[in-house]
């Protein structure tokens, strides 16, 4: 329990992208230079209210306070432009005053000289000079009146503010349009320090919200949106959903065990798996393994496999008691028969899960490690603790009563399974044909399954942070920003800037989803009239450009430049394709490197690492299990009949997901591992009991029918318990968890179906064929 309290949730990109991957290293260097993902502050209200003297004073205090905070890299907004305009206006006023004075003195000197040449006295010369000064003043009167109309360049002067905000026609001036999307909103962009942890990024947002809570803007609503808030909302949603749904799942499991597993201590298996899960998560806490979406999915597999271990041991014990054995004899027989069989299933599954450690995705590696550890703990608990509790509870009860109770509990389900087993064996061919048809269909449509790794589509759609973000996108008209990092010895040379300008122009024309492009080439070409000038002019432009404009575009040593493409909101799959095309189309000059960076690039990269590698992971996992079974069984038939159903169920699940419309997401992408674990165990248990019955002298058909009726009760109880418990997930408001619940129910049901209907007939047919061949 103390270890569980140490668990921390990780839902950011650290769970999806290895810090050693190229894109993660590139992104870290980019953020070190240009800061992290921007925090957007949306000011909603009439522009006159937003830019009132009182509110501008608050915004000025905000910039002063947060600009001096080491957590913030840069702040850009309308106030930034107003302050630059004020500085430029003050400089212009001083220059105008100096120009006016110089022009007046020059005109006065010329007038005085002309008067002297005409023989005028000193008084007449002074009058001529005064007249010349007045004429200069009159000539510049329009400019003077305009300056007087605007007044002193100050944030306390509404006329000056209006002159910066609006053009001559009264529309928002071009320089302000990037921060004022319409007449009722304004934007402030705050770039936090790069490479902050999720908690630090969230705190940076909270600090901003706290400032505006304590310094409210008059008549203006302030909304702060950021990726950090979305990550926090996802984390909270996962936690809250899992807590409620897990409680409901346990309640449903209790009901199913009560009605289907009619033995003494029928809820003991649930207690055992609960303890196993608690110990596993506690160990995670001590080892510092975070809770991610994948590790939450692992809980499903642990409960499914763990409860099966306990039910199988408990079921075999009840079977031996029903045969009239003493408690000690029943316990020994149960353990001696089930220990190796379940041990084989355990070993094969562990090896399969360990292979997940080759994944590039951190949370998949943690997923595999947690599963391997968890099922070992579940096995140990079922083997020792469950038997100890049952022994202590039953040893004082008369064996006759225990036998009667065990016999009564075994009757109904076993009779149903006996009939089902005979039916499956009698109709092997048709069942096999249908199974193969569905498997082929699943293999075909598997490549057609839609992919969705966009957290926004997978989380509860009514989450305030998501609603705010979508409202802001609608107002701003931008769905996201694709960022690229350009590196060279000097990115400010005409050759590099010329290529960068052409690259941006071509991207805008080739990809309609790109709304605008921003780069160092944009700044230079705009200042130079639409062209890239020679190096001296470039240096002069960069020297005169305010640092607030250059900060997100150029590093101090001129070796790195940032490029950003504002795009419409498109699915992550399309974003991934766009990034691939942008990289292919770059064709940079020699010595220039282009690398994708930023949250969209990181998110898109997970599609290949998580979803794209899904089939590879499944094949490696299956291959590892095959090797283990080969070492253990050393019989090709047993190995094939254990592996084939696993592959078939994976294909069936793909077909069902395609027909239902469930996409591949970070959770459903690991469903293959769940199927491999559950189905492998079911088949190993069935094959183990089948071989046991054959050793007792039963012919193949009778041996299989007995195996289905005996092992099938425990398998069916396991499947129904898992189905009922995790069917509750379907009610989740978290789209990703809901889809995972549906996929889990489908996978467990199909694993049960193939174990008791498809494979028994094939196994019996194969053994009968071997007998016939041997008798010839």
Predicted regions and their residues:
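Extracytoplasmic
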Residues: 122-263, 498-501, 505, 542-625
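Hydrophobic, glycine/alanine-rich multi-pass transmembrane helices and their short helix-loop junctions
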Residues: 256, 343-393, 626-630, 652-663, ...
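Hydrophobic transmembrane alpha-helices
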Residues: 257, 274, 290-311, 354, ...
